[in-house]
Amino acid sequence: MSDLFAKLMDQIEMPLDMRRSSAFSSADIIEVKVHSVSRLWEFHFAFAAVLPIATYRELHDRLIRTFEAADIKVTFDIQAAQVDYSDDLLQAYYQEAFEHAPCNSASFKSSFSKLKVTYEDDKLIIAAPGFVNNDHFRNNHLPNLVKQFEAFGFGTLTIDMVSDQEMTEHLTKDFVSSRQALVKKAVQDNLEAQKSLEAMMPPVEEATPAPKFDYKERAAKRQAGFEKATITPMIEIETEENRIVFEGMVFDVERKTTRTGRHIINFKMTDYTSSFALQKWAKDDEELRKFDMIAKGAWLRVQGNIETNPFTKSLTMNVQQVKEIVHHERKDLMPEGQKRVELHAHTNMSTMDALPTVESLIDTAAKWGHKAVAITDHANVQSFPHGYHRARKAGIKAIFGLEANIVEDKVPISYDPVDMDLHEATYVVFDVETTGLSAMNNDLIQIAASKMFKGNIVEQFDEFIDPGHPLSAFTTELTGITDKHLQGAKPLVTVLKAFQDFCKDSILVAHNASFDVGFMNANYERHDLPKITQPVIDTLEFARNLYPEYKRHGLGPLTKRFQVSLDHHHMANYDAEATGRLLFIFLKDAREKHGIKNLLQLNTDLVAEDSYKKARIKHATIYVQNQVGLKNMFKLVSLSNIKYFEGVPRIPRTVLDAHREGLLLGTACSDGEVFDAVLTKGIDAAVDLAKYYDFIEIMPPAIYQPLVVRELIKDQAGIEQVIRDLIEVGKRANKLVLATGNVHYLEPEEEIYREIIVRSLGQGAMINRTIGRGEGAQPAPLPKAHFRTTNEMLDEFAFLGKDLAYQVVVENTQDFADRIEEVEVVKGDLYTPYIDKAEETVAELTYQKAFEIYGNPLPDIIDLRIEKELTSILGNGFAVIYLASQMLVNRSNERGYLVGSRGSVGSSFVATMIGITEVNPMPPHYVCPSCQHSEFITDGSVGSGYDLPNKPCPKCGTPYQKDGQDIPFETFLGFDGDKVPDIDLNFSGDDQPSAHLDVRDIFGAEYAFRAGTVGTVAEKTAYGFVKGYERDYGKFYRDAEVDRLAAGAAGVKRTTGQHPGGIVVIPNYMDVYDFTPVQYPADDVTASWQTTHFNFHDIDENVLKLDILGHDDPTMIRKLQDLSGIDPITIPADDPGVMALFSGTEVLGVTPEQIGTPTGMLGIPEFGTNFVRGMVNETHPTTFAELLQLSGLSHGTDVWLGNAQDLIKEGIATLKTVIGCRDDIMVYLMHAGLEPKMAFTIMERVRKGLWLKISEEERNGYIDAMRENNVPDWYIESCGKIKYMFPKAHAAAYVLMALRVAYFKVHHPIMYYCAYFSIRAKAFELKTMSGGLDAVKARMEDITIKRKNNEATNVENDLFTTLEIVNEMLERGFKFGKLDLYKSDAIEFQIKGDTLIPPFIALEGLGENVAKQIVKARQEGEFLSKMELRKRGGASSTLVEKMDEMGILGNMPEDNQLSLFDDFF
């Protein structure tokens, strides 16, 4: 018994008789861990044997009682030198296990504690009845039981449960007989009670009233019971139970109201053991308000009955009582000024690796009182913008960094080369076998070498080395070396000296030489022997550079490829000999193919420029110290993604050196080169490497724990020694040593989310390393990487001593943070590109067009509007944005395409005048195309100029032109005209690529980039990850827990992408690195465009962003123009035939019954959907203004349903008077008499859904003003319901395009149908479409039935839309022809009289390339056979068969018979 242990026994007054037992003979205290914050002491004891159960209980109870008096919690575990597996002792400890958490849970204890155990076949066997859930036991309880037995001193005990049939039958029999006896007794008792009751019952008239029931008293008792009730962990609930109490956090809430007016709150809670679905009913609104505390993020105590939900079929708690509880969050308890700074933290922008948003990371650090926190995501800086804004808001310094992948530019083939003829040299080709990868923690067990000259082995060296301990199973499995091999082996130092003698005057050769040489040098250093100084050739790098076309360059694949014998891979003698044979093959090829004859040439002439692609990656943390450093960081990120990307973004060391100004460099994690050197090469080597860095990082031992499992470090003591070595490295290299946390999530319980994300990557991912080989491989554990408080970090490093721990955790991290300057990540102003004379050009183009239309001098209303807009546009530097948009639109127009506008740009009259948009925002007006005389209607009586009656100019008699949609300029650039303009344009999808290239041409390729996006894991995808994790790792989660885990795993960065039409333009007097790094979308280095590294939204207020979107409408208009020769600009917006489509079908020559709809809206953009067709049927629009209203109502949120629809139905308002588009609010209120500023503000509040969110005082002020100006109450109430509104300019542009398309449907129908099917239709079924009306209607009916049963597929839903148009076309008397092998086009539908001929691409499964190939092949000659169609046309057998079935091929033979006789003619 050790003195320390004896002293402890004295303190707890352990009985002397127990102390004298043999088990206590060598008792000792291995370690005591003291957690100062939680006041927990962990004792680790060593005993000669497992303690008798009575002794164990006495020790346990006395330890607990003694320390409890000092308010200290105690836990302990035992390591026993000898273990007694007798059944009696195991049975006693088995029952004892259920007295310790977590095995003492009520359900586990009651179900399992009374079972019998035995020890058989090296296993603890639990005999259980057959109805026990074995899977649940294995998944939820077995791990805890194993850990408890290990703590008792039994070591890692294998525990299994078997079904005991005899026990099952016995318990079943007892249950049945017991139940029968109870039923019999209950019946008898009931009869006797009835007789006694009748005998005792007094006459009725003498009955006394029952005492009044005290409901308040009962409620108070229930509440008291609720307060004191035992909390049940959610994981324990497996069946229906009553009066269960949970405590946990709400993570999902949904409130519903039934038809009867009752309310139901469906919510989900978690206590982090599992999660549960719960329900709470409320009879009315008043009762519902009592449960406002049921909100997302709230911590509650709830009581209720667990029942199976009949709809979800899962266990659900019907809540009876609920109260909010205080949740004690982790806090940093260190005093102000003594708190650490976290300098290594990942956010959810670390691809598929970390969880916290940068906002939550910064908020947590600020809440804990930390003065700074660093962001160090893997190889990207996409969290910087949000981190910058959040840190400023939180009043904390954000340190901007990243964890980079550093590689050597050129990985040498030869180390320390000299001038030597390779053909005349002597080589020692060697290999070592070790017990692990760490030269400092693992041992050499074999050194073997072949000395070779001119390809011949002239001498061999082969020695085993006894490491002084048994080999692990993994080492033996990997190397084939057993303990028997090592018996009688020479001492290590003897073998090392002999090997050095063996290597004299030779070039050393090894495969992956950096490992072998590093291991040898570390051992030489340890034994005061000289390190390797002679030249070394690495055959791994030799092969990579000599044979870059090979995918694998390992020893095994290379020996197979070159047919070199390798009988026992991973035994040093065999590996060395095989490597030698390969060496001389390589030397021969290098000489013959590359002229390599001298050792010096290997590095100078053979190492490839792109050898960095194969170089081993080392992590380093890089931090921005100042503004210069920020720009350099952006350059490094860009270069790593654009120029040096290979699997991951890489930064070659010389590139880092060239951009190091303003940056600070840290050694990062266990994947850093300094840590690796400490582990594999020794402190001296690590010191040399550390000189390159600005500071050394050390991390909590828990972060390095996976290295123990991977056998890179022996144990906890080994981890602590590595940390001490790193501190020593810092001391010798004169570098600051900082303790960092390698944060990947914030709270300890969030570990499971990262586990799920990482495991979803599969075993091929580096982060998802495995232990073991083959089918037995298991995933390596992930480190405990939560955000630690200062106290927790000090506990982690307590082994260093109080002062040193405080220095590395607090003082040094604060010192480093003070060296970081504040930087501006996101600029505060807009920086537009420069175009020479942009302001003058915009003004000139505006007035030029205005004079052309309205005359010179201009009408006052036009002149004032232009002056107002130009003052804002030119004064705020927006002219270049207007001019750039005008240039792009003009170029597309010159290529023959119209460009539609989106959003509010049509609110700008200047935009109209310079040709950016067709929408004219002036009040409705007439203007004469001959003499420019004009008339404006400004009283609001007309909604659109297109609705004005036709009339001639009173001055010259020329028919007036009509225009004007009455849209205020404020809706585009804000009331003060200083909002950055967002000009969105709809280009034809066919012309979009050309428009994108126009941007490059105008501004320069080095200033134009696609707008980057970041794609994160969606909750549905995360749900799939959770289910996959369940499947792969034998887990079982209830539905609520799956939902929680999916929500926790969602939001992590998965990939990058690009906006479909967004292009960011950098000002030509700056460069892109002033704003953002750049990269390729989705890491596709073959992409033609680079994107912004930042999500474009993060910088859209700093640089010009052009939205050049592809749209079907301009494409369709161009197609119709090509077919008809009609200029779409000349199509009137008030054509009577077109307007008739909105009220009936007569203009199409069909009845509603024929086409299945009461109007002619099918296939008309904006109005062809079922939803909008329903709106048309209800409102019967007759004017362009009313169509604008419909467009606004259909695109808004809570504008039509439950709002305008009801007002129109009830006759309170009309389609004309309801609120439709956002701009109408401002115009209407101004006409009503409100001040423009207030009218604008009300419009802004309503359109953004803020009406009910602003203060009651502000809202009442607006309401009073509206009522004072006779705005009706229904209008005010309608404002309060709106969540989002559509801009009128957007609606006007879309409706105008729609009416042009509709014009062709009415007046040129076959052209319309040709364009529709060529451009808009998404799905085809040619057999049906060319089968006539009956076939089309039958298929539509079939899909309709499927839709009613929710069985229709997405393809069928798209097909139904297509068939509606086919049906209409056929009913109008046109025909749908069959696919024609010699007449059909590859892509476009063709018009042949009154018939449409479909293209090849319309055939299901036939792609564009094959379609074009068939057309090309038929131009070369007729297809003589199906075989020829397949061969020359590129059609698959399936496609040819499908064509044959449809009658397209006629009597075409299978193959060309004449070809059999070609040789005879």
Swiss-Prot record:
Keyword Electron transport set for record: no
GO molecular function, one term: DNA-directed DNA polymerase activity
Domain Exonuclease: 427-583
Pfam families referenced in this protein's UniProt entry, alphabetically: DNA_pol3_a_NI, DNA_pol3_a_NII, DNA_pol3_alpha, DNA_pol3_finger, HHH_6, PHP, RNase_T
Keyword line: Cytoplasm, DNA replication, DNA-directed DNA polymerase, Exonuclease, Hydrolase, Nuclease, Nucleotidyltransferase, Transferase
An example Gene Ontology biological process: DNA-templated DNA replication
Any GO CC annotation of this UniProt entry: cytoplasm
Keyword Transferase: yes
Alphabetical list of InterPro entries matching this protein: DNA_pol3_alpha_NTPase_dom, DNA_pol3_finger, DNA_PolC-like_N_II, DNA_PolC-type_N_I, DnaE2/DnaE/PolC, DNAPol_HHH, DnaQ, Exonuclease_RNaseT/DNA_pol3
Enzyme Commission code(s) on record: 2.7.7.7
Disulfide bonds: none
Subcellular location: Cytoplasm
Catalytic activity: DNA(n) + a 2'-deoxyribonucleoside 5'-triphosphate = DNA(n+1) + diphosphate
Primary role: Required for replicative DNA synthesis. This DNA polymerase also exhibits 3' to 5' exonuclease activity.
Family indicated by similarity: Belongs to the DNA polymerase type-C family. PolC subfamily.
HAMAP family per UniProt: DNApol_PolC (MF_00356)
Name listed for the protein in its UniProt record: DNA polymerase III PolC-type
Lineage, opening ranks: Bacteria, Bacillati, Bacillota, Bacilli, Lactobacillales
